[in-house]
Amino acid sequence: KLFIYHCDASNENDVNDLFDKINKKTSKIDALINNVGISGPTGTIDKLNSFDWENTLKVNVISHFYFTKNAIPLLKKNKGGSIINLSSGAGIMGFPLRSPYAASKWAIVGVTKTLAMELGKFKIRVNAICPGTIKGDRMVRVIRDKAKFLKVSKKSVEKEFVSMASMNCWIFEEDIAKMCS
């Protein structure tokens, strides 16, 4: 069965309330897909403010903690399952002008590796997906902001992002969904 709920993923009380609702509907789950994230600010670290840094980490990393903490007991009751954390290519290589985003995605990779070691004995698989450039509204903003910061064309920034992908092409949301299924 699939249940759909809405909550503020960066608010621990909202996530806890969400899992209270889930616990009333079912005693176990098969999988958790942590796909919460924001792009965060663009710029050199000396030009960024602490609010944007902290907010990027809160949404991109701490929200995963809230969901994972609540999901683990349900996965254990199921005697196994899967946690899939969405990270980014920025979580495995440097990402100039995007340090808060990169830091958050590296954190997700580190937590994923740690949880895989901790939860394997419960038959809970934990993996990260680290896609390249995903076509969508978020990337439109990231490209715009980077082009503005560097004073170059959006087209040149777009080419740069696409060239970083191993297949030199855009990744689409549907591709990510297929990886999770």
Q: Which stretches of residues belong to each language-model region?
A:
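Alpha-helical segment proximal to the catalytic Tyr-Lys
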Residues: 73, 117-121
